[in-house]
């Protein structure tokens, strides 16, 4: 078991190593849609690439989610398979968001032997989600 400082150092090293291996600018928060973002997540059990829709207005949040959900067939056939769509996802802080994600199980940020596998997963899945978004962003952004 690592101390808190060791865990923080290891996570920092993980992200620096990822940035060195895949040194490119990701869209992440630069979607031009308020509270709509792409994210990476990793812990000691899994790695995930996510789309989080966190709009404070539930109606708008659901509209954005439903836009992507309407494209689910195209998204899964042409870009990323095995996506999970969660219209009402509850964060630990009690906030309700909409989340779409793909995950790789049985990997760990604390074990360097998994890092390349996680990095490749992150790159492949995020790149595919970004390509989908860039192709369909006008449709996704067009809500009432």
Q: What is the role of each PLM region?
A:
Residues 1-144:
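Charged, terminal alpha-helix-loop-beta segments
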């Amino acid at each position: 078991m690592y101390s808190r400082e060791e865990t923080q150092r290891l996570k920092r090293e993980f992200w620096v190593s990822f940035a060195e291996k895949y040194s490119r600018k990701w869209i992440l928060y630069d979607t031009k849609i308020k509270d709509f973002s792409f994210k990476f997540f990793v812990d000691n059990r899994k790695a995930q690439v996510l789309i989080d829709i966190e709009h404070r207005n539930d109606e708008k949040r659901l509209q954005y989610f439903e836009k992507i959900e309407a494209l689910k067939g195209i998204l899964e056939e042409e870009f990323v398979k095995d996506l999970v769509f969660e219209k009402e996802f509850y964060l630990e802080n009690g906030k309700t968001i909409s989340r779409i994600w793909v995950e790789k199980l049985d990997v760990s940020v604390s074990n360097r032997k998994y890092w390349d596998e996680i990095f490749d997963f992150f790159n492949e899945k995020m790149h595919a989600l970004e390509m989908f978004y860039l192709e369909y962003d006008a449709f996704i952004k067009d809500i009432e």
